[in-house]
């Protein structure tokens, strides 16, 4: 294993006149492409059982996004109030209590029964399915607060996956032009934390950097060299677990100001990268960073046990 020293990002900033601030989740492709990426990454990986399990989880997400009727959209007046006050228009606290969200949860839990899974994961799902209203509301609240109890991570994984469906559906229905920056590391659509950031190669935004919400999958434009935990543009460096750091497609962006780090993916170098799937598959980078003074700032409910 070769570890590169902390150094400035060697990549050249793309020549984009003005990248769009927000890229909304594409429901037709989001979860389907992610599932395919999980499956591809599982081939030959020592994480294959878990990656294949998450591929199954993501296939269910894709199926439900296609099968379920659209959710009640966020009211236009709420969007405008949120815009005026620099707040996200999706109410995370209220989202889990809506009837259409509860339908998503129920159908997701039912479909997850058929997944091949370890005994502990099967037991956790059974307990989630039979949870009373108070317990389910508590778990939804934890997921929406990005605060998952260590003793019940497996239970919360299922709830988080179901809530990702509902959040992405709501975010996809927003008018992206009405979203505004909130503050560093906060999704402008739902207020969630980023799982990581990505330098993209999409037409019209080549070389631009986007943070990706761990909940609703909205992507928002950020300065290329900037800490997404504290906002500092000083003391930023990069580490990788690959030979030839300049060619690495997944790196740790570290900040000496707040001693945090977050993954940055170079989709412009590898178009098949998925921010969630490749976050999980690059667990070796997390293990490397555990031996440093930096604390992970990216949030991923699928990686909370590591």
Swiss-Prot record:
Q: Name one GO cellular component term.
A: cytosol
**Per the record's keyword annotation, is Acetylation included, yes or no?**
no
State where the protein is found. Answer: Cytoplasm
Chief site of localization: cytoplasm
Q: What superkingdom does the record give?
A: Bacteria
Q: What family, per the record?
A: Belongs to the FdhE family.
Under which name does UniProt file this protein?
A: Protein FdhE homolog
* Species assigned in the record: Rhizobium meliloti (strain 1021) (Ensifer meliloti)
